[in-house]
Amino acid sequence: MEKYAITPGDFLKNAGIVGMKYILDCAKAQEGVDFGISEDGQEMWLNCEFIQNADWTSLYFQACVQNFGRFTVYQGVMEKIKCCIGKIQNEKWNPGKNEKDDLKFINDKLLSNSYQAGFENIKDQIEHPEVYITLKKEKLIDKMTAEELLERLSKLQVFLEQEKCKETFIMKSVVYNYINRFWDGKSFLLRSNAKKDMREQFEKDFSEPFRKCFMTDHTKAKDLCIDCGEPVTTKEKVSIAFMKEVGDDFTRKRSAFWN
């Protein structure tokens, strides 16, 4: 079995190793077969066959949703919707300050620029997009009858529970609240890609090059990776200028460094 070893390094690399472990857990990868950790805890290895066959894009998005989803705006919106529906169904709906604030929260968060961009990306891949379109045209307000609010909120709840909606809206929060702390200006964080499919951008910029690296013959490669010393081809050289400045001046450095 051919293995690829990953050793600790600076802050960003170590954070990446922790992230990789989260992804492997989500993939239910077999320890000792697909990956492993040395006895002294100073090395993680990956089975090269596993690397080439894994759907890294799906695993990455799945890990982000699973680990950060409960801390995002999406979760807050779902809780507000559930609370409002419960009050109406139990005949305790009395639109006061709390109720008005809940409706405003739902409107504001779901109609934010990032959520609207996310909707545009997936509107042809989901069911009942008209639910979101209706919200854009007519926001939820406390002056609506309880029956109308119940119908609107119930449809909105079902709409948001769709896996594609859940993943897209959670990722919009994760991207700007977590990922953006470490890198920017590349893939789905490149401004010109804001309205493009996030999965497609991640696959093109990260997953596909990662797999190709392990399928490429490096016997004639003249350059070496700055981190592990392994040979890399000219096409595999990756600028790390998109990384945030945490301990290094990334803006001025270009190398075949893999984050």
Predicted regions and their residues:
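Basic, glycine-/proline-tolerant helical and adjacent loop/strand elements
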Residues: 160-259
